[in-house]
């Protein structure tokens, strides 16, 4: 059973700052962002990892093993404040070992003559844009373990390409969308973890690696809180260098505007006579403190 502690503020402990690659500083300095927190998890014991390997007949990759020896799972969240309402937005999750379970036939399909996951297998690679890569299989040809359920938007999976017994060097990270199509993400777990952090856990960010991309609503959040993709060096720089296409300071600006009195124009003469337009003020003559020309 995984042991956890109450959520902590992201910058409250140095090792948590190291675990998040410093991205918490960027989030905390972004306009409108609030409640950046991490659920701290204790490291997994070695015998727990060995037990998982024996149970699943798979050797855990070295980078995955090192991750669990540092923290038994990862859960970081952040919210935004809009019109006094706090909206949960970012979510970064890596399942703990107890939830690193194999993706198998759902009980929904347990009825007689019901379709199975194996029925989705075909030889056409339809829906998979990575034609040069062999996609995972739902049958015994692959062993698939769930790393993140993506809040119901799909599943990020650790895939043993050649089934069981699973070898550490035969693993890849794939994304299974809601239509049950596979999309390749990274060769290694540590590379996926960097993607997770640099995309700030924005909703549906995994769909950026599909042929159809993210939804229009997710694009709005992406434009406001631009992911730090493909340039992890920005994570260690000052937050002043982090810029967005939109200016969030204007989006979250207070509605209480300061009224600025308008300057009054020249007062027309009391008489009703029409005369030529007002003459421009002389430039060479001295003026008083009130700005009116001095007559001689």
Swiss-Prot record:
Domain of life: Eukaryota
Chief location bin: cytoplasm
Entry's Gene Ontology cellular component terms: centriolar satellite; cytosol; microtubule
Basic residues bias spans: 254-265
Chain segments annotated as coiled-coil in the UniProt record: none
Region ranges (Disordered): 254-296
Location of the protein in the cell: Cytoplasm, Cytoskeleton; Cytoplasm, Cytoskeleton, Microtubule organizing center, Centrosome, Centriolar satellite
Keyword terms: Cytoplasm, Cytoskeleton, Microtubule
Biased composition, class Low complexity, residue ranges: 285-296
Annotated function: Subunit of the tubulin polyglutamylase complex (TPGC). The complex mediates cilia and flagella polyglutamylation which is essential for their biogenesis and motility.
Assembly with partners or alone: Part of the neuronal tubulin polyglutamylase complex which contains TPGS1, TPGS2, TTLL1, LRRC49 and NICN1. Interacts with CSTPP1 and LRRC49.
Protein's UniProt name: Tubulin polyglutamylase complex subunit 2
Organism expressing this protein natively: Mus musculus (Mouse)
